[in-house]
Design a protein with these regions (language model features):
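Feature captures the catalytic ectodomains and active-site-proximal regions of enzymes
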Residues: 1-115
Length: 115
């Protein structure tokens, strides 16, 4: 108020309800994320994931030879073929983060300036 302070409020990014599973092919050294993975030559459907292989273009670290990143699109989540039965129903309808939806990428900011 009268002290002339400007107040800036923000929060962490949000999460996304996931409903569709997609298979990911990866070795045992790949990261374990549900909506984001990195590893050596990991693969998923282009319909369900963004596959980043030109790491320098995105300012991403190369964590080893042939490293790439997968980011889940829309309401997809990643499953390994050998764990499909175990996790598919458990994860469906849950809220996850790490993908590239607007809810996960945008951070709200409110600036209150006294008049």
């Amino acid at each position: 108020g009268s002290a002339g302070f400007k107040v800036v409020m923000t929060s962490d990014h949000g999460s996304k309800m996931v409903n569709r599973s997609t298979m990911v092919a990866a070795d045992k050294y790949s990261s374990t994320g549900i909506r984001y993975k990195h590893g050596r030559n990991i693969n998923a459907s282009n319909k369900s994931a963004v596959d980043i292989r030109e790491l320098y273009s995105y300012h991403l670290p190369a964590l080893g030879h042939q490293t790439n990143y997968l980011l889940a699109k829309d309401d997809y989540y990643f499953l390994y073929p050998n764990e499909q039965r175990k996790y598919k129903n458990m994860l469906k309808g849950s809220f996850q983060h790490g993908g590239i939806s607007m809810e996960e990428m945008m951070v709200p900011v409110l600036i209150m300036d006294p008049k």
